[in-house]
Amino acid sequence: MTDMIEQSDDRIDPIDGVLADGVLADDVLAKEREQAPAPGELTPFAAPLTVPPVLRPASDEVTRETEIALRPTWVRLHPQLPPTLMWGYDGQVPGPTIEVRRGQRVRIAWTNRIPKGSEYPVTSVEVPLGPPGTPAPNTEPGRGGVEPNKDVAALPAWSVTHLHGAQTGGGNDGWADNAVGFGDAQLSEYPNDHQATQWWYHDHAMNITRWNVMAGLYGTYLVRDDEEDALGLPSGDREIPLLIADRNLDTDEDGRLNGRLLHKTVIVQQSNPETGKPVSIPFFGPYTTVNGRIWPYADVDDGWYRLRLVNASNARIYNLVLIDEDDRPVPGVVHQIGSDGGLLPRPVPVDFDDTLPVLSAAPAERFDLLVDFRALGGRRLRLVDKGPGAPAGTPDPLGGVRYPEVMEFRVRETCEEDSFALPEVLSGSFRRMSHDIPHGHRLIVLTPPGTKGSGGHPEIWEMAEVEDPADVQVPAEGVIQVTGADGRTKTYRRTAATFNDGLGFTIGEGTHEQWTFLNLSPILHPMHIHLADFQVLGRDAYDASGFDLALGGTRTPVRLDPDTPVPLAPNELGHKDVFQVPGPQGLRVMGKFDGAYGRFMYHCHLLEHEDMGMMRPFVVMPPEALKFDHGGAHGGHGEGHTG
């Protein structure tokens, strides 16, 4: 890094035996692996939580960039494990926590310092589906005798960094094709003109994001402002970033964990008839890492803490519960004060009751949490991932949760008074969006795997309304009819389905749009839209039985079910850029595309889905220039529509 940086001293201890360019001596690694445990022998809560160092770019001389270098590194994920080869920002996993003030414009040179010919840190395999009634084999460590994917092993260090949540121009956003190799830098400028929030940065390279992020290329980014300062929230050692991610590890011939990162997925179709290729489901691993360590513990005082949580997993949706020594949920101590785009208007209690039984965290979602440990001195509390078929804290292998542990909090008795009081109002500047704001409309359909022409994968379909249904054949491939709450049936035709299809959405800067994601499959997709903050307007249940996979369209209309209301959760009413879209359901979100121009992306944030095609571009330009656009797909109904 350059001398333009203020950085904390909280660095992670180095691994003995690391040579130049991040290479670990062979004899050191061999000796470590000889002493490695079997998969079931890892002890939970055996190592303290590591906290990434804080990097504060200098506030003056914006024309001089801050360099953050991508480097190979060796990380001990658990005290009982051999070192693990990873790639990290500034050689750390996660990368440094970048902290800026609102309006502090910074330029970052994301420089690739991973030497050519470096070993790729991730082993990738696809394994057969197990017998019915048995746990999915992807949550079991080891390759199970399956040969690694040689094409993944041959991947170069090719990366582009996306600052997730940032309002910045398209040239700075981390366009997936614009990845750089060794010695080159991605130069990005971030205005940071945004309310206080937690963003995060991660690799976004086309086709290979799922492996690059697993290799360690992620970190968090905090924007501060005066409104946040006035709240007097816990800070310093009492503000802790928690980047959680599930991982899997390979084993040696004796069944011992060798520390090697393993991307292990399950084949659900051996040979798709359209492509001849196998179809696998996204990655879910058995081990949870927090800040790059498996099942750590944190020593905390009996006071208030602020936890800045990010789900940095490829695909796992965590259902988090805070439990005590007897596996009972702990109510009354956790309060959510912010989400993806900043502070909520008021705190939301997370009591693990009927209102919020779990803290459901999909990949890329962020949660700003206040935790009150004042009455818990001398106690040990555990944050766990609750499986669908077991109580909190209990393994649920059939539900995909082989090990529920996430981390442990060990509360010290200090007998010191903590004068912090939970504010009644968090953000006086927050304004709730409503449907009567002039806006345009978009309809995006998320199709089930196995739909005609999809190669066995779910897809994003951009839809355009057909004003006269006589203009299209019904039923037909790519044609969907939808019956709304008013009983009217509208006909839509597909205009795009893959990333490289023609540009479909061109948006005038400064305009509002309502995007409706209609999920016709049972798979939950966390959808992410770059550039803009959105608010969830509503959810609607649908009867999707009229959609025919073999046809690739509807034989009878997909129908909104007015008799099945879907209430919004109290903690999803703030600014968000990732939205959980289960199916069959329609999700309506409203956002304003302002502050930047350029070409951006929206996509499913299950990284395997993103890499396999669930990603589409959109363009934002000045509305004055949009009048001369020849693309013809700019705004649905256009700014000014309120219906």
Swiss-Prot record:
Record-level GO BP terms: antibiotic biosynthetic process
The keyword Repeat is annotated on this UniProt entry: yes
Top EC class, one word: oxidoreductase
Requisite cofactors: Cu(2+)
Record field: pH dependence: Optimum pH is 5.
A Pfam short name: Cu-oxidase_3
Record: residues binding Cu cation 1: 162, 528
Residues that bind Cu cation 3: 204, 530, 603
Domain Plastocyanin-like: 87-224, 494-621
Task performed by this protein: Could be involved in the spore pigmentation and melanin production. Catalyzes the oxidative coupling of 2-aminophenols to form the 2-aminophenoxazinone chromophore. 2-aminophenoxazinone synthesis proceeds via a sequence of three consecutive 2-electron aminophenol oxidations. First, the o-aminophenol is oxidized by two electrons to the quinone imine, which then conjugates to a second o-aminophenol molecule while still bound to the enzyme. This product is further oxidized by two electrons to give rise to the p-quinone imine.
Family annotation (NCBIfam families): AmiPhnlOxPhsA
Descriptive protein name: O-aminophenol oxidase
